[in-house]
Amino acid sequence: SFPTRRSSDLMNTAAVVGFGYVVKSTVGFQNLIDMLSNLGGNPLISFASATTLIAGATGSGSGGIGIAMEVFAQKYMDLGVNPAVLHRIAAIACNGLDTLPHNSMVITCLAACGMTHKESYKPIFITSVCITLIGLAFAVFLGIAFN
């Protein structure tokens, strides 16, 4: 028989993936995409910001990178951004805000460990959001300096 814990984890993941698809289909999400499409400033900074915000909104790094590359990649390549640099920035940026409390990995790990968000989210936030965003800032700096 299928263990209860595993079916619960599977349901958590399915629910959060479904959440990402629902978010993507809303007017508010389209407004976010429109706003992010008009970010000015350095292309790498605006692309990194857009990618990580999309990942945060969908609660998914893979969803964030997929949407960002589909919507923004050609625009930034047309501005002269090296495609390899763009990809590296996207790969880091999609992990910046993807582990907010509604992320399926966070929910599943906490459920598997029998912990609550209140008990355990702070160290998750520090290691997976704060440190990743610091790394993203460094990668953007290097991309600007050497692009």
Regions found by a protein language model. Name each.
Residues S1-S7:
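Short, small-residue-biased leader/transition segments that mark boundaries at the very start
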Residues N12, V16-F19, F29, M69, ...:
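Alpha-helical transmembrane segments of polytopic integral membrane proteins
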Residues T13-G20, F47-A55, S128-L142:
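Hydrophobic core segments of alpha-helical transmembrane domains in multi-pass membrane transport
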Residues T13-V16, L39-L79, A91:
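Hydrophobic alpha-helical transmembrane segments of multi-pass integral membrane proteins
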Residues V22-N38, F146-N147:
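Membrane-interface helix termini and inter-helical loops of multi-pass transporters
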Residues N31, S62-K75, S104-M115:
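Re-entrant/interfacial helical elements at transmembrane boundaries that shape
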Residues N31-N42, V85, A91-P101:
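Structural signature of hydrophobic alpha-helical transmembrane segments
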Residues C94-N147:
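Juxtamembrane and boundary regions of transmembrane helices in multi-pass small-molecule transporters
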